[in-house]
From Swiss-Prot:
SUPFAM superfamilies the record matches: Actin-like ATPase domain
Designated gene of the protein: CYIA
Protein name: Actin, cytoskeletal 1A
EC number: 3.6.4.-
UniProt organism field: Strongylocentrotus purpuratus (Purple sea urchin)
Protein family: Belongs to the actin family.
Length: 376
């Protein structure tokens, strides 16, 4: 869509990254970390035009002198002032648009508290004067992006994971399962097991280094026990990583032990079922007649599904749980890191969607609760 004048904005607010851009585009124009940084020591950088807060990549690059905070935890906004800073940064610095001129589509985690989406609605209309807005469920958008309207989405980002069965475009709320285990927990776990190897990572700045190690070197083993034996008996699985200061560290079985926690949350001291079981449990909560369609359309989405080997392992684990004759298909689109955003871009540019927007006028008449009537 070349006509940015009236194009809707699509903002996928993740716990870890904000993905933002224009409806009709095939990828987000701005992707930056959902972080707000504040100087650790007031006045250290006298005369450097020091600001009281930094957002996104700028906070990331100055992380050595800042305390970094994520305003979203587990997919839910915990600090609205910081969240507002992130939205302000998105509109004015990243997309360079006037928010009062564009309808905006926001995304939210399934099973989000009602107050959360009301507050989002209120901020968009009252702080940013949006002409119209809509709040869509992330997993549903991922399914649209894969070209389906029925299937089960396993969506795992930085802060929260969900299994969301969707039938003919509607999420089935009674069968949605939520798992507070996602990318950030895996990063923390990798920090912990690297410490056991004698490397110390403790600060918020060092956590970002470990996140990079995770994204570049970790993978999911098809058979965990087998892989552990291979790692113990040879150095074939070892990889080296150069830290920003030039020190080189070696990482071995940590490469697959880290994401294994998705399948065995006990590694993190959590009592919940692994992602394969959660998926299966979610399917079993659905009507028996639609299960076949869900098994055959299991869609992975979100950054924490980007580990190499995760789709094959998921296939293997779900096959072991499902009835023996069931056809199981795991769909892992290569662009799944952004599939929520892509689905939003598709939805907001459909002509049939245009009547779905909540307008400023409707908001003024009904208040924030309008969001529950119009977005479901």
């Amino acid at each position: 869509m070349c006509d940015d004048d009236v194009a809707a904005l699509v903002i996928d607010n993740g716990s870890g990254m904000v993905k933002a851009g224009f409806a009709g585009d095939d990828a987000p124009r701005a992707v930056f970390p959902s972080i707000v940084g504040r100087p650790r020591h007031q006045g250290v950088m006298v005369g450097m035009g020091q600001k009281d807060s930094y957002v996104g990549d700028e906070a990331q690059s100055k992380r050595g002198i800042l305390t970094l905070k994520y305003p979203m935890e587990h997919g839910i906004v915990t600090n609205w002032d910081d969240m507002e800073k992130i939205w302000h940064h998105t509109f004015y610095n990243e997309l360079r648009v006037a928010p009062e001129e564009h309808p905006v589509l926001l995304t939210e985690a399934p099973l989000n508290p009602k107050a959360n989406r009301e507050k989002m609605t209120q901020i968009m209309f009252e702080t940013f004067n949006s002409p119209a807005m809509y709040v869509a469920i992330q997993a549903v958008l991922s399914l649209y992006a894969s070209g389906r309207t029925t299937g089960i989405v396993f969506d795992s980002g930085d802060g929260v994971s969900h299994t969301v069965p969707i039938y003919e475009g509607y999420a089935l709320p009674h069968a949605i399962l939520r798992l507070d285990l996602a990318g950030r927990d895996l990063t923390d776990y990798l920090m912990k097991i690297l410490t056991e190897r004698g490397y110390s990572f403790t600060t918020t700045a060092e956590r970002e280094i470990v996140r990079d190690i995770k994204e570049k070197l970790c993978y999911v083993a098809l058979d965990f026990e087998q892989e552990m034996q291979t790692a113990a008996s040879s150095s074939s699985l070892e990889k080296s990583y150069e830290l920003p200061d030039g020190q080189v560290i070696t990482i071995g079985n940590e490469r697959f032990r880290c994401p294994e926690a998705l399948f065995q949350p006990a590694f993190l001291g959590m009592e919940s079922a692994g992602i394969h079981e959660t998926c299966y449990n979610s399917i079993m909560k659905c009507d028996v007649d639609i299960r076949k369609d869900l098994y055959a359309n299991t869609v992975l989405s979100g950054g924490s599904t980007m580990f190499p080997g995760i789709a094959d392992r998921m296939q293997k684990e779900i096959t072991a749980l499902a009835p023996p004759t069931m056809k199981i298909k795991i769909i892992a689109p290569p662009e799944r890191k952004y599939s929520v955003w892509i689905g939003g871009s598709i939805l907001a540019s459909l002509s049939t969607f245009q009547q779905m927007w909540i307008s400023k006028q409707e908001y003024d008449e009904s208040g924030p609760s309008i969001v529950h009537r119009k977005c479901f």
